[in-house]
Amino acid sequence: MTRRCVCIAVGSLAMASGSGMAQGYRVRVDVRAQAVSFRGLIADSIPADQVVTGPSGGFETPDGYAVRCSSGTHCFFFRPGPELRGIPLTTSASVILWGLGVPGLTVRATGRLVADVGPDEVWPGTDPAAQLLEGYVEYQRSALVARAGRLMTASRLEPYGFDGAWLKYRWDDIALEVTGYGGWGLAQAVALPVSSAALNPLDEWRPQDRQIVAGLETAWLYRAVDLRAEYRRELDPQDWNIVSERAGLSFGAPLWRLPVRVAGGLDYNIAEADLGSADLRFTYAQPRYAVSAGVRRYRPFFSLWTLWSAFSPVPHNGVNASAEYRATRQISLRARGEAYWYEDAEVVTGVVPQLEDQGWRASGGGTVTLNSQWAIDADLGLEYGPGASSRYGDASVTWTPNDRYAFNLYGGTLERPLELRFYDATALWLGGRAEALLNRQQRLWADVAFVDDDRDRPDAAASSLSQVRLRAGVTLSFGSSADRMPLPPAVRPPR
């Protein structure tokens, strides 16, 4: 029913645009599909008196599956499930209308249709089938910009979606912008209300009503200085309790008269009286090279209604540096490294008295441009952290014979040994991609990849997710001729 309503709305919008109700319009449609297969796990059990001791000394089933036994009469284990196939299909569209009879008035909308047309219907995120990402009316006049509808706002306090109104006013004399917004909030990281049945992993813990959100942002933009402050609060309309309350500060500016730019910021969780994430970075850029270094602190954020906020997530701190160097016109090199450590979790672990709380990661790569048609790119990376590590490498070769066609061959490998898990994962992939730009309004692409994935473990539950992945897409753009008017003739300056 929802998909039918969206189709009717899109059709009506196209008819209205074609009939002259709007002097100008622009539509962009993107269709993507892929075919994937994977093997899940099935929970199983066995009576405790049928368990045997395996070669490693642990308990196993008679056919070799490692089991987990407690004080009950049964032991539990997982066995590989059947191969499942999914074919997710996504169609997204963006529409903009202008020339509606009111100067400065435009209508913008972005939505998508999602479905799994495969035989097993296992792909996540396909419910609901029709999703409105953004859809609002905008009025812009001089220093004032006003919007109403479904909106997405990006800031230091993470992107946030809501149904309501947004207003910004700018004072050019003092380079000051003030933005205010409010409405009914959407769930975190998804364009759905928090009360949607599609977001119901916690059953009765899920809020029954949508939260009310209000925020205020102030920005001072003077020459190369960008200073911003923001405040945001969410309330539960049933009892008007606070769901979240945070404030953030961010800035970017040149470092005195040096060719160095400094940027950073922090956020503070007012509702829980905790310092959130923070970062500070220095960047020195020259025509042939650029170097940056910084420090950061990351603390996960959860609303007060969620179960996760009760666990007091532990933040981690880190120092990092990166560099890019253009050795010649054909060769460019890059590198990045970071060391990080977690703060004290304030817990007692009798079985493991000394827990690891630090790690590091490093990566490097380069690009070689042989000529106007051929380019080679490669990267290597290492990471060692608490309980896990990874090693990866990838490379690609790109051939661009002309402005209309591009071909890419890529491959790589990834190893993920896990200290506190019962298997080590290794993946190897090889694929190719082709892209065709038929004209300025139409683009086609296709991608095929062969993936060899192995989950190595010392019992019969070892499995492989080796597969062939197929992906394809098409992008179409069309609209009125108002946005494609030819440039006026050039005017030669007087000599």
Please identify what each model-predicted range represents.
Residues M1-C7:
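Bacterial N-terminal signal peptides that target proteins for export
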Residues C7-S17:
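Bacterial N-terminal signal peptides
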Residues A22-R495:
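Gram-negative and organellar
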